[in-house]
Amino acid sequence: MTSGPLTTNNLNDFHVRGWVKLRAFSTEDAVAMEQVLWQRLEKYGVLREDRSTWVNIHAAGLSQRARQHRLFREAITAELRQAVDQLLGEGWRRPKDWGSLLFSFPEVDPRPWDVATSMFHWHMDPLQNIDRVRSLICFSFLSQVLPEGGGTLLVEGSHHVVSKYFAELTPELHAQKSKVKRLRFYQYHPWLKELTTGKDLDNRSDRFMADPTDVFGYPLRVVELTGEPGEVFITNASAVHATSRNCADRPRFMRVLGLHRDPDLADGALTNKSLRETT
């Protein structure tokens, strides 16, 4: 296995939970990228100094134009590159830039923050990592994202259950449309069904985030991705994740990036078995 910044404990966390957190770029670069976004948002009437303009607009082309900026293409740490080497092998495909933009402004909705309900909020990229880690999704922070501040929700441990589900599908079920297979997955276990059907609970946060629940022998729990400018969560692409509401007092600025093992190269990615053997 390639050496790098991820320790045995880090690799164990990635195997068990489906994520590991480190630094994607410097705090200074993150602050500079956030400033670029504010400058671009001014063209849509959104002003940093005027909270009354902080509305969740459909800013067509904003992400694409911002990603052409030098910082968005070049600002990355050796730590992140080396960590991806450890997880995917050195033959992963380098992207042209380091991710699409995710942004949301504080809501005026009086409802308290809670875990997303509808199954259409929850999604995953299941087929890449059934036998080994071939794809990652990286969620990085341009601004500070606090709890209940719009950070992505992730079901830690769910990549194991996703792999189990797809490995058990018959050829006939595999041939079904992706939407059908996804709907069947959310009926695969009572906990998943409860998470994604909007069943009324006094506090969904307590139910799904406080303590792990055993699902087919794997501890599953919803975690909220929060962090400081420049930090990144590297996640298994098969882990179930969802959007969440921003009930904080500040905007959320993040980037999301999929990284993939080059299928034309010899497969040097970590198998699920080799990840277990590092622990």
Where are these regions (language model features)?
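Short, conserved beta-strand element in jelly-roll/cupin
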Residues: 123, 127-147, 226-229, 258-261
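A generic fold-level signal
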Residues: 14, 96, 133-134, 147, ...
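Non-heme Fe(II)-dependent double-stranded beta-helix
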Residues: 2-16, 22-129, 270
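Extracellular structured ligand-interaction cores
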Residues: 17-19, 133-139, 149, 222-224, ...
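A structural signal for short, well-ordered beta-strand segments and their strand-loop junctions
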Residues: 21-24, 93-98, 137, 151-154, ...
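Non-heme Fe(II)/2-oxoglutarate
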Residues: 46-49, 164-170, 178-185, 189-197, ...
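A short secondary-structure junction signal
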Residues: 113-115, 120, 148-157, 163-168, ...
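Short, solvent-exposed loop/turn segments at secondary-structure junctions
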Residues: 26-28, 103, 144-147, 159-160, ...
